[in-house]
UniProtKB/Swiss-Prot annotation:
A zinc finger (SWIM-type) spans 43-76. Keywords: Metal-binding, Zinc, Zinc-finger. PROSITE patterns: ZF_SWIM. This is Uncharacterized protein MJ1493. One of its GO terms (molecular function) is zinc ion binding.
Length: 231
């Protein structure tokens, strides 16, 4: 029986990260797991399967953290790429066959993010939102993710979508941290001055005035008459 030196709370958080699709990829090579896990940033993780699943991570906690356990959870659920099997498959094959195998690998394991760098930050944002009601401290991860990765790379539709997902998650919009997260997104929307995006935001505001009360403050500050943004 394998003894893993992970705190029960870390194990539970790691499982939640895996369930919410925050493991970008997991590759097994020899007796190690390699992968990336999304938190407030994207962290590189390595797990030694021969050393009680000891985990190394580029996050501030460094060792046996929730990101490492999320990678273990991917492995335990057979959601990983076996690099040695791939190497055996392509050994001595002609170039055309190798390219075909690599193409199938990319499609099968959704690894095009690593090849094309087009990772869906929206899905990661939604995954983090789902974690907030389960443990309060996840709001800090979400805020950091918004600042460091999401708002500068998301398109206008994605910014609106994340606000909608925050409402769907039934978050407390009177909580200062939730409001701060919302203002990070709103600041970006109004900075861009995209009229169509602001129209969609106003429509969302009308449906959810209780939750999005702070949007009214933005409209007063930025526009004398927000009805100019109606269709």
């Amino acid at each position: 029986m394998i003894t893993m030196n992970y705190d029960p709370k870390i194990i539970e958080r790691g499982k939640l990260y895996y369930r919410n699709n925050l493991v970008k990829y997991c590759i097994k090579y020899k007796n190690f797991l390699f992968g990336e896990v999304v938190g407030s940033d994207t962290y590189k993780v390595k797990v030694d399967l021969d050393n009680n699943y000891f985990g190394l991570c580029t996050c501030q906690y460094k060792y046996n953290c929730k990101h490492a356990y999320a990678l273990i959870e991917a492995y335990e659920n057979n959601n990983y790429v076996d690099a040695e099997e791939i190497f055996k498959e392509i050994e001595d094959k002609p170039k055309e066959e190798i390219l075909k195998i690599l193409k199938n690998l990319v499609v099968k394991y959704y690894l095009w993010d690593e090849f094309l760098n087009t990772d869906s930050l929206l899905n990661k944002a939604i995954g983090l939102i789902k974690l907030i009601p389960l443990e309060r401290k996840n709001i800090y991860t979400f805020k950091s993710f918004l600042r460091n990765q999401f708002v500068k790379n998301a398109d206008d539709e994605e910014l609106i979508k994340v606000i909608d997902e925050m409402i769907r998650a039934d978050l407390d919009f009177n909580n200062s941290d939730i409001i701060e997260a919302l203002t990070i997104i709103l600041d970006e929307i109004f900075r861009r001055e995209n009229k169509e995006a602001i129209k969609k935001l106003i429509n969302l505001y009308r449906k959810h005035k209780k939750e999005l009360w702070i949007v009214g403050d933005y409209l007063i500050e930025y526009y004398d008459n927000y009805f100019d943004y109606e269709d």
